[in-house]
Amino acid sequence: MKQRFSKRTRLVSALLTLAMVCTFLPFSAFAATGDVEINNTNFPDAKFQEYLKTATRPGTSEQIDKNGDGILSAEERNQVYILDVEKSGIKDLTGIKLFPKLSTLKCSELGLEKLDLSENKELYTLYCSKNNLIQLELSQNTELTYLDCSGNKLTQLNLPVGTKLEKLICYDNQLSALDVNSLSGLTNLSCGKNPLGTLDVSNLASLKSLACYENDLTTLNVKNNSILKDLSCGGNQLTELDLSHNPNLTDLYCSDNQLSQLDLRQNKKLTTLECFQNKLELLDVSQSTKLQTIKCADNQLTSLDVTKNTALNELDCARNQLVELDTRNNVALKKLNCESNRLAGINLDDNVYLSDISVGSNTYPAEMKSDRTVDLSKLPNRFDVERASFWYGGKVEGNTLTVNEGVTQVRYQYSYKNYLTEYFYLDVSG
């Protein structure tokens, strides 16, 4: 009897102790399964509290706090699938973990410095761009398919192994390294404006769009990315770029690098090519007949054949060394910049849609004979002496230019399209 009483006493004592502990536990201790009070303990940010008290769930007229009692029940919290707090003034999203069913979070432009979403394991889409984030915790978010964390101060980005991520936008941060090897389902990667020295995308067979511009890359291997359509790698230090395994490429932006050659023979679907500010001496675009835009200014090109690019509507080949440019077949051309080359003249009469034209500052190195004459009939690019007038520095009779003594450069006006004229120059300095 004594032993039975002793067991009962111990059981009652244990139950009383448990009751006392539960009595003094705060609401937050039951956050995972029970009610959560909208207070400073659970949600330190006052504006976040106000949002939770007054905001409605997207797509409904119901408030998040349905009965307005300042307490979120488990049912109320579990019905929060989308939170859009962009530009709301909230500075701290502590308490976000209390919404376990959250699938979409939009929290851009808030000034957030830290964001821990490790307990929001059903998160599918995350927009947290243009904050001041130095820490982003996503180690448990394996369901994440879309992440935009651009415009922050992140020095590292640790993504969960096995994540379903399809689109990763992390440009304009401070990332010196980025490991995307495990993201086999990634289709879009935008990581420009970071100090990345290397980038390995060899495992990303599903990649369709890659933007890695304005980094510190010296090499870029895209041989395994056969379905790649859009590549933006400008503003790096690339000396070569092999695109022979990218037949689906439609848009290429590789300007401001150190490329001395660019082989586009396998890129027959290209519609946009921007390769300005490189060291290109040759550029063969004859196989890329679908090109609509070519920007190849500030290179070292001595020739450019665009006769097969009949869909072309914009051409910028300024500041090269071109002596010829035939645009007769480019009937759709609307914009042309060929200034600062070596053209003696140009005829654009066939380009009836051309309205934005820059042809100035062209100087052709002409051969002057010992008698100070230049045979104008030998000038390239279909030079027509009848289109030239107002010669300064010499006199023209027929196709012969006689250069004045002491003159090293002759100037003249040239009618390049109907009644439009521009000054061209002949360098006769020898």
Stretches found by the model and what they are:
Residues 93-96, 115-117, 136, 157, ...:
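Canonical leucine-rich repeat
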Residues 138, 147, 180, 210, ...:
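Non-core capping and flanking segments associated with repeat-based/extracellular domains
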Residues 202, 265, 274-276, 285-286, ...:
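Long, contiguous interaction/targeting segments characteristic
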